[in-house]
Amino acid sequence: MLTIFAISDSIAETAHQVTLAVAAQFKEKIKIRRVPYIKTIDEVDCIFPEIAKIERKIIISTIITVDVREYLTKKCYDENIYIMNVLGPIIDSISSMLNTNPEYKPGAMRQIDEIYYKRIEAMEFAMQYDDSKDYGGLKNADVVLIGLSRTSKTPLSMYLANKGIKAINIPLMPEIGVPDEIYTIDKKKIFGLKIDAFQLIEIRKKRLDKFHRISSSIEYAGDERILEELEYSDRIMKRLGCKTIDITQRAIEDTALIILELIGYNKNTNSY
């Protein structure tokens, strides 16, 4: 039986996936052995006694570091072992075309995967706790958005989620109040969304027109009701002592940027 060693200086996920794709093209049984975290020449030497025990073998390598990659290749040639360096030739070709040197960062793909899954997790979080569906996520939230109806809480939550930030949004309504749990979390996480009364009236009227709603429309988009809600939201935000952001005539991206800067977001790692 043929054994393919998938060797990498990171978790060997890329090497493993390439090997699986190749093995799937053959009916014969092929054994795949994953060998991660080979970052030094000494570590290459350490794995060879085990490799030497296998009669029929191939090595598929995604090692990035040049000296380790070249040493592994020479070692294989000396031992008459077939080796395929998956990333090396591609990196060299692109480097030549761009006339620049690559960074040679082991585990770069894993970092990309981690960022991707962090975004997915944040999006699922935002949907689960959207618009006060459940307050159980407050303690796990990176950001808590509070504001009146039609202050862009949901789209802002989703925009932040796309940056890997877990955001929960809570609507402010005089009849309902806010959950007691909100007073127990770090106020630095809480952001109050404020808006000009005239713009809020206009937004709500357009919302009603869009769905042809007549009942209770006067109250929902009426001047007195909106002024009452604005006064209520101001009281809550002052009581919480949270940061406030005026979203009047402000794009969601701009509001998100303010929040990301305030929480110290690092765009390179999707963390803060």
Curated annotation (Swiss-Prot):
ADP binds at G147, L148, S149, R150, T151, S152, K153, T154. The keyword Kinase applies. It holds the Pfam family Kinase-PPPase. Keywords: Kinase, Nucleotide-binding, Serine/threonine-protein kinase, Transferase. GO terms for molecular function: ADP binding; ATP binding; phosphotransferase activity, phosphate group as acceptor; protein serine/threonine kinase activity. Bifunctional serine/threonine kinase and phosphorylase involved in the regulation of the pyruvate, phosphate dikinase (PPDK) by catalyzing its phosphorylation/dephosphorylation. This is Putative pyruvate, phosphate dikinase regulatory protein. It comes from Clostridium botulinum (strain Eklund 17B / Type B).
